[in-house]
């Protein structure tokens, strides 16, 4: 799941000419690395998939540079992104996870820009995190991984993963009857659910976190397209 940040602050950061350089130097604290990985993916609007593929390959290379042979490479998916010309994106397997990453990203964007504008006597200033080797040691430090595992246990992540966790379900006729029952079951199985209906009360029926109710006539192609776009913006 994703949380898009198209705020003026995120947009300004994404529009910085050297954003790829300053955003990929490292996190503002090594404590963040278990949530954000060392760097974000920089999404090139002309080829988003290639950007993701390049990130995955770069992460594997980073692991190979510093592993002592005893560690197991973590998954190579990014945890946040800078979408050039648009803003930032936080990724997570559920809304709690993506929300944590989104909050960290907001602080990171501000801190990087503050550091870039900071001029210290005898120094050129600029954003300079710790070395990449130190970041690797922090990311793969047993106590860091144990900390993340402990936090996940507290929010129930050690339980059986729901079948539809990380999925987005769109249900038509969702304000009542079979549609509502299906929506509730999908939600119970871990999906975030977008409910569509002609009933104007759909927005109040779907008021829980992880649910979105939209007034929509499914025979209207433009209305359905709008609903899909809203689902993307929300989740």
Kindly give the residue locations of the regions a language model identified.
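Glycine-rich flexible loops
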Residues: 1-169, 181
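Canonical Rossmann dinucleotide-binding motif of NAD(H)/NADP(H)-dependent dehydrogenases/reductases
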Residues: 161-194
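The conserved SAM/SAH-binding core of class I Rossmann-like methyltransferase domains
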Residues: 196, 214
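Short, conserved active-site loop motifs that form the nucleotide-linked donor/cofactor pocket
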Residues: 210-211
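The beta1-alpha1 cofactor-binding region of Rossmann-like NAD(H)/NADP(H)-dependent oxidoreductases
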Residues: 215-229
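A glycine-rich helix->loop->beta "capping" turn
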Residues: 230-235
């Amino acid at each position: 799941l994703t949380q898009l940040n198209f705020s003026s602050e995120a947009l300004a950061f994404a529009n910085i000419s050297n954003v790829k350089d300053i955003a990929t130097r490292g996190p503002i604290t090594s404590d963040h690395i278990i949530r954000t990985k060392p760097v974000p993916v920089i999404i090139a609007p002309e080829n988003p998939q290639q950007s993701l593929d390049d990130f995955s390959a770069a992460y594997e290379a980073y692991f190979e540079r510093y592993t002592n042979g005893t560690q197991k490479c973590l998954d190579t998916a990014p945890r946040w992104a800078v979408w050039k010309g648009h803003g930032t994106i936080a990724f997570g397997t559920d809304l709690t996870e993506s929300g944590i990453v989104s909050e960290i990203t907001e602080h990171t964007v501000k801190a990087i820009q503050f550091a870039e504008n900071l001029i210290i006597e005898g120094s050129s200033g600029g954003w300079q995190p710790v070395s990449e080797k130190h970041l690797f040691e922090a990311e793969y430090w047993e106590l860091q991984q144990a900390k993340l595992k402990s936090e996940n246990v507290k929010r129930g992540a050690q339980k059986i993963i729901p079948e539809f966790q990380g999925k987005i379900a769109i249900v038509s006729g969702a304000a009542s009857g079979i549609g509502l029952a299906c929506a509730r079951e999908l939600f119970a199985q871990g999906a975030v659910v977008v409910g569509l209906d002609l009933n104007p009360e759909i927005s109040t029926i779907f008021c829980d976190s992880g649910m979105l109710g939209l007034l929509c006539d499914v025979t209207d192609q433009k209305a359905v397209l709008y609903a899909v776009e809203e689902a993307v913006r929300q989740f």
